Amino acid sequence: MFDIGFWELVVIGIVALVVLGPERLPVAIRTASHWIRLIRSTANSVKSELEQELRLQELHNDLKKAEQLQMSNLSPELQESIEQLKAAAQSVTRPYEQQNTIHPAPAAAEVKAEPAQPAAAMTHDEAPMVTTVQSTDVLADKKEEVKP
């Protein structure tokens, strides 16, 4: 890889032994070998992923070419029927697209609300009667639910 011979490795080992000493040299060798293994494994994984992606891309391109060649070699009747099928598929998807679009709200002139009477215009007798009727209906419904 680096074109280093045996004697060159021996010289590097002796220099490392002198610089680091006999106590720290084994730890330094283990650390260096760990980093080298980590770098090699990362490089190999990246290389294999790139090769796999390139193969997939090549297969995809070959498939597109084959599909185009088959479509160009078809008879006019078959090409016409394929166009009709594509048009039918588009017409089927149009109602779903229209259904999923947001339509504007109806105009204010179309929706006519009855004017409400202000609370001050109501007599004293009318207001309590309405609330009393509503509360008795709710109480009657609750009593029926409680009884077995």
From Swiss-Prot:
Record-linked PANTHER family: SEC-INDEPENDENT PROTEIN TRANSLOCASE PROTEIN TATA, CHLOROPLASTIC (PTHR33162:SF1)
Membrane-spanning segments: 1-21
Known role: Part of the twin-arginine translocation (Tat) system that transports large folded proteins containing a characteristic twin-arginine motif in their signal peptide across membranes. Together with TatC, TatB is part of a receptor directly interacting with Tat signal peptides. TatB may form an oligomeric binding site that transiently accommodates folded Tat precursor proteins before their translocation.
Please report the name of this protein according to its UniProt entry. Answer: Sec-independent protein translocase protein TatB
Q: Does the keyword Transmembrane apply?
A: yes
Name the UniProt key words of this record, in alphabetical order. Answer: Cell inner membrane, Cell membrane, Membrane, Protein transport, Translocation, Transmembrane, Transmembrane helix, Transport
- CC terms in the record's Gene Ontology section: TAT protein transport complex
What membrane topology term does the record carry?
Single-pass membrane protein
GO BP, sorted A to Z: protein transport by the Tat complex
